[in-house]
Amino acid sequence: MTAERPGAVPLGRPGRPPMLGLGEAYRAQVFASIFLLLLSPAGVGARAKNDFNLVHPLVTMEQLLWVSGKQIGSVDTFRIPLITTTPRGTLLAFAEARKMSASDKGAKFIALRRSMDQGSTWSPTAFIVDDGETPDGLNLGAVVSDTTTGVVFLFYSLCAHKAGCRVASTMLVWSKDDGISWSSPRNLSLDIGTEMFAPGPGSGIQKQWAPQKGRLIVCGHGTLERDGVFCLLSDDHGASWRYGSGISGIPYGQPKRENDFNPDECQPYELPDGSVVINARNQNNYHCRCRIVLRSYDACDTLRPRDVTFDPELVDPVVAAGAVATSSGIIFFSNPAHPEFRVNLTLRWSFSNGTSWRKETVQIWPGPSGYSSLATLEGSVGGEDQAPQLYVLYEKGRNRYTESISLAKVSVYGTL
């Protein structure tokens, strides 16, 4: 049965001609007003905002933000890109600056660059967190903004691999001035304990619709102590944090083999019905060489096994991927589109909440490519309306994907 659209009024009744009594005359006046509104500039703009026929993604610019090989601050390797747009329209790009080697372990900085002109120019690299000479240093991470307060939160983990250390910690820094300055690190162990939680890598979200409108959600994965995917939640603008329940790997708490169920690095986004989709790395290729998709209907208080699916269209070589939902209902997804190797960084999009994907794709880079992160810039920027832009920050190389981190700017409507 097709539901009647809110506010729709039937003209007349079946079996009898429509009569313009007082009620019908009023309805006719309403429909005339709506018709005139749709012809107005405001109405045309509103329709264009959700007109999927306008969507023709086009890469309009690309630039390297970081190059590995001790070329920037004697950093050996830059990895794990994160990108976000702040409520004020500033772009913030983050990466792990691995001091001595490309290893996931070892000492690191968190590198940051800012753009205030929609990605055209970027500030010099700033190192906003330094873990010293820690043998099992920091690992990024997830970034999320609160649209009410304007605060940007950045999460990372310490001692994730228990290499030369015994206690894992989830750490948090924040900025109240669009990334110009940052707080001292806050250890969340008193709030959430010391089980290893690896945020992201990618972006968190703030709920835009009920249930729990305004909630901040940051999802990640654990290890043998608490493997699988689970999320950190805040209902007080980031003052306090707690875990929602998660989806565990199978067999739980034991080493995994090929084809075991083991969801890993993940990226959440919200659908217009208020549900949250978590697109996750399929660490052991359970069921397919593709992405695991989880869905929560209560703002990530719970994740249920019956709401876990697999997306065979999103072929994946076991990697952290980018995913984002635009305000007009488009879902974008980026990953190295190959079943085995980290090559062919590809952008895909969906007009059906991710239940299917358009046949058209945009190849961002054909060669070695690894992790990627997505952000959008929509609506008014600096008081001026603009066409929506998508930003793809990704690991890129000619021989190895760890050679650099590059930014591709994509015009969603294909306009320059």
Curated annotation (Swiss-Prot):
Binding site for substrate: R79, R98, E265, R281, R342
Catalytic residues (positions): D104, Y371, E395
Keywords from the UniProt entry: Carbohydrate metabolism, Cell membrane, Cytoplasmic vesicle, Glycoprotein, Glycosidase, Hydrolase, Lipid degradation, Lipid metabolism, Lysosome, Membrane, Phosphoprotein, Repeat, Signal
Motif (Internalization signal) on chain: 413-416
Topological relation to the membrane, as annotated: Peripheral membrane protein
Catalytic EC class: hydrolase
GO cellular component, one term: plasma membrane
Known glycosylation sites: N187, N344, N353
Location of this chain's protein in the cell: Lysosome membrane; Lysosome lumen; Cell membrane; Cytoplasmic vesicle
Post-translational modification: N-glycosylated. Phosphorylation of tyrosine within the internalization signal results in inhibition of sialidase internalization and blockage on the plasma membrane.
SUPFAM superfamilies xref list: Sialidases
One biological process term in Gene Ontology: ganglioside catabolic process
GO molecular-function terms, A-Z: exo-alpha-sialidase activity
Function: Catalyzes the removal of sialic acid (N-acetylneuraminic acid) moieties from glycoproteins and glycolipids. To be active, it is strictly dependent on its presence in the multienzyme complex. Appears to have a preference for alpha 2-3 and alpha 2-6 sialyl linkage.
Family of this protein: Belongs to the glycosyl hydrolase 33 family.
Subunit structure: Interacts with cathepsin A (protective protein), beta-galactosidase and N-acetylgalactosamine-6-sulfate sulfatase in a multienzyme complex.
Protein's name in the database: Sialidase-1
Organism classification: Eukaryota, Metazoa, Chordata, Craniata, Vertebrata
